[in-house]
């Protein structure tokens, strides 16, 4: 809970800076890249998390890795290092994306199907969801053969379960 609050607070501040610099998308990509590196590179993670390594040394290391970034992006990475919040990068990125989606009327939708839908089926689903919600839809599709057929759509807290598995479970319970 506290980690989510921290992520939200930092994400809001970073988003505000990104808006004022007109680089919202670029900064998201930067933060996402930092998160990927933090999650996959043990040496990087160890270095930025190690309490005995001075912050200035951590910043120098980050500058060597991210030196090609524009100054505002690099300063945000430095700020997160200064505040010992780089370890919270996953939560910050998730909250940043939520803010971006909310401000740009984008809805994150997860669709689970028994088999991979065609491009046309995905496009039709996106079109119907956009028409229903009045928002642009970011569709993430996953496959789960255990649902047998049909699909499950998750929009925020709402779940629309049209799977054969659920229908069979309903019949079995009655």
Swiss-Prot record:
Q: How does it sit in the membrane?
A: Peripheral membrane protein
Compartments, as annotated in UniProt? Cell inner membrane
Provide GO CC annotations from the record.
plasma membrane; proton-transporting ATP synthase complex
GO MF, any single term: proton-transporting ATP synthase activity, rotational mechanism
Ion transport as UniProt keyword: yes
Sorted alphabetically, the keyword list is:
ATP synthesis, Cell inner membrane, Cell membrane, CF(1), Hydrogen ion transport, Ion transport, Membrane, Sodium, Sodium transport, Transport
Where does the signal peptide begin and end?
Answer: none
Q: What role does this protein play?
A: F(1)F(0) ATP synthase produces ATP from ADP in the presence of a proton or sodium gradient. F-type ATPases consist of two structural domains, F(1) containing the extramembraneous catalytic core and F(0) containing the membrane proton channel, linked together by a central stalk and a peripheral stalk. During catalysis, ATP synthesis in the catalytic domain of F(1) is coupled via a rotary mechanism of the central stalk subunits to proton translocation.
Any extra detail in the entry?
The ATPase of P.modestum is of special interest because it uses sodium ions instead of protons as the physiological coupling ion.
NCBIfam families, A to Z: ATP_synt_delta
Provide the protein name: ATP synthase subunit delta, sodium ion specific
* Gene field: atpH
